[in-house]
Regions:
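Beta-sandwich/jelly-roll carbohydrate-recognition scaffolds of carbohydrate-active enzymes
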Residues: 2-18, 22-177
Length: 177
């Protein structure tokens, strides 16, 4: 079986492992170099993960009915949480908007799971490791084909230092440029 869900909005697509890892995503176009390419290059490919502190006991994915919104539920030693991933596409002012934006909503379901948010994009097919610039509520990844920005209400220091945080409320992450 293929352990990935697929989301996209006709500008880009992302393959999301049932463990929450975005292991394949070309950005900003389908024919661009991947920014997350762990699916093909485990060592240099880069990924965007929302892993629990301990081991994953159970995981499953499903789409919200009649949508391209992917829900991944993770059960771990400390509890259970859900990651909802989607790429917005909407109609407004008599035109279609297809922003280069990936949204991740992380909800605690049971217990007090600790998770690590790890965003490791790459450029030029795994050859470029971008520089990180930390601002008040976002991290910019510089040196890629297009500047990449991760905006979140998670404490940025936990992301930069690859530390676990207790998920006791719903959190959001937006990946944009």
């Amino acid at each position: 079986t293929y352990d990935y869900g697929l989301i996209g909005n006709c500008s880009f697509q992302a393959h999301i492992n049932k463990n929450t890892s975005i292991d394949w995503m070309c950005w900003p176009r389908f024919d661009s170099s991947f920014i997350f390419g762990k699916l093909l290059d485990e060592e240099n490919g880069g990924a965007f993960t929302l892993f629990p502190h301990g081991e994953i006991k159970e995981s499953h994915q499903h789409y919200l009915e009649n949508t391209n919104i992917l829900c991944t539920e993770i059960t771990c030693e400390e509890g259970k949480y859900r990651v909802i991933d989607f790429a917005p596409r909407f109609y407004q002012f008599e035109r279609h908007f297809i922003p280069f934006m990936l949204i991740r909503k992380i909800e605690p379901l049971e217990g007090a799971p600790r998770i690590k948010v790890c965003c490791q994009p790459t450029g030029s097919y795994g050859q470029v490791k971008p520089e990180q610039y930390v601002a008040s509520n976002h991290i910019e990844y510089l040196g890629l084909e297009k500047q990449l920005r991760l905006t979140t209400d998670f404490p940025l220091s936990y992301i930069i230092n690859n530390e676990s945080i207790v998920l006791n409320e719903t959190k959001y992450i937006a990946l944009t440029y």
